[in-house]
Amino acid sequence: MSIVKIKDKTFKTSIPEAEILKKVQVVADRINKDFEGKKPVFLAVLNGSFIFAADLMRMITIPSEISFVKYASYEGTSSTGSMKTLMGINQNLAGRHVIIVEDIVDSGFTMAHMIEELKKMNPASVEICSLLVKPGNLKVNLDINYAVMEIPNDFIVGYGLDYDCLLYTSPSPRDKRQS
C-alpha cells in the first residue's frame, strides 16, 4: 500500500489507476452510445476534474465539444455550503446536450447550482458525469447517470483531486488515513 503525506494529513492508495481507467472506459462507451449523433458539450468543472476530463475525452469517439467552468465551495476538507463562480459558462448552450464532468459529487451543492444556471440557458438536456460519488453525503436530489464509482464518505486526493488547493497528481486516488 502506497502512502503519501500532504500538509498535515496522510493518505493511502484506495483505487488503483488501472481500475479507474477501466471504469472510465465503461462510462465513455455509454456516453458514446447515448449521445451518438447529438454532438454534446462537455463542461468540465475545474480544477479537480481536469485529469478525469482528459482521460474521458480521449475515450469519447463521437463528435463533441469541451468547455471549462470553475466554482469554489471547499475550504480544506470541508464544503462551505456556499458557491462562488470563479469562471462561468461563456457559451451558447440553447438546444445543446450538456454533460457536466465533475471529479466528485459530495454534498451535491455544486451540481445543483450548475444545473440551475444551465437551465436558464435552455439546453436540450443536462447530464452529470462524475468520477466519484458519495451517495451517503448527498444533501440534494440529483440524477447522476454517468458515475464512474461510488465511494464512502472519505476525503480523497489524487487523480486531480486536491487537499486545500494543494494538488496531488498521483494516477491513483488516495483516501485519508485515520490517525
Q: For each of these PLM feature ranges, what is it?
A:
Residues 1-39:
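Active-site-facing substrate-recognition patch
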Residues 30, 43, 51-88, 98-99, ...:
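A generic "structured core" feature
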Residues 168-175:
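Conserved small/polar residues in nucleotide/adenosyl-binding loops
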Residues 38-46:
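Short glycine-rich phosphate-binding loop at a beta-alpha junction
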Residues 3-5, 12, 34, 58, ...:
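Short secondary-structure boundary/capping segments
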